């Protein structure tokens, strides 16, 4: 007895594709416009910012990796965050970490602006006129991660 496949070769192809992707999970969607930036990105970002303010790279690699992992859950618009975080994780010294942190900060700022997201409560966005880059930080006293102790209060808050 022969079996007839209902739907023909195209249907079989679709079934095979569906079966192959059964274990696949679609990336999470970006936060709704007008929402709050994901804490999974912001919390490790703030740890990196604090380390750079202290003229240190302790914990930068691990926290940048956490940012990259979190960014992958935000969907396609966050690909620049993921890429910048991975570059920061590979930084070999303080100067390079600060440079890559600037790239990451710009990527996050662009993502947040594009989706009209705000930082979580208590987190503010600041801007350094010397490097022309933003950063996020806790608290109301400027703590510039691009220059650390040499120019700790250089910059201004945007929000």
PLM regions with names:
Residues 19-23:
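C-terminal motif of bacterial Sec signal peptides marking the signal peptidase cleavage site
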Residues 2-16:
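Bacterial N-terminal signal peptides that target proteins for export
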Residues 25-27:
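Bacterial signal peptide processing site
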């Amino acid at each position: 007895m022969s079996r007839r496949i209902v739907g023909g070769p195209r249907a079989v192809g679709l079934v095979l594709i569906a079966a192959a992707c059964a274990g696949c999970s679609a990336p999470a969607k970006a936060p709704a416009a007008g929402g709050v930036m994901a804490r999974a990105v912001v919390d490790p970002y703030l740890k990196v910012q604090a380390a750079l303010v202290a003229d240190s790279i302790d914990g930068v690699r691990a926290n940048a990796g956490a940012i990259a992992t979190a960014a992958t859950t935000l969907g396609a618009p966050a690909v620049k965050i993921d890429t910048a975080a991975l570059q920061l994780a590979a930084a070999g010294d303080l100067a390079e970490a600060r440079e890559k942190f600037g790239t990451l900060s710009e990527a996050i700022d662009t993502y947040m602006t594009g989706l009209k997201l705000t930082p979580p409560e208590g987190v503010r966005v600041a801007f350094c006129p010397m490097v022309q880059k933003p950063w996020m930080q806790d608290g109301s006293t400027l703590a510039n991660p691009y220059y650390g102790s040499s120019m700790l209060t250089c910059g201004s808050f945007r929000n």
